[in-house]
């Protein structure tokens, strides 16, 4: 199982480019394309979100609570899939250092670690 996480969403748009482009929309488009490609190749996938919405719990009121709840729910979704691989899509922005750019890849090499 490959869990595809389109980072941010809903009220949490993530980084915003100089032209006003919001990260969460780009993340979702990339995640949907990746999902389609992996399914075409015969992989079993699950997406954390399929629309511009966060997945926070009903009790979350403030933006801080919503972000914390959203992250907690994403982790729970991944952990519920035994042996899952997580691909979390993000676009980072560092306006103070425009030379900093490119892909980042993080992975957990410890089996069973949270």
Residues covered by each model-derived region:
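Active-site-proximal helix/loop segments of hydrolytic enzymes
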Residues: 21-114
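Short glycine-rich His-centered loop
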Residues: 1-20
């Amino acid at each position: 199982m490959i869990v595809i996480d389109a980072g941010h969403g809903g009220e949490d748009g993530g980084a915003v480019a100089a032209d006003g482009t919001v990260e969460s929309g780009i993340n979702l488009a990339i995640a949907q394309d990746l999902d389609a490609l992996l399914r075409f190749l015969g992989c079993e996938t699950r997406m954390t979100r399929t629309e511009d919405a966060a997945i926070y719990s009903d009790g979350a009121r403030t933006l801080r609570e919503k972000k914390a709840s959203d992250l907690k729910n994403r982790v729970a979704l991944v952990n519920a899939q035994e042996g899952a691989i997580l691909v979390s899509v993000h676009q980072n922005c560092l306006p103070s250092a425009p030379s900093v750019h490119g892909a980042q890849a993080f992975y957990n090499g410890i089996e069973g670690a949270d």
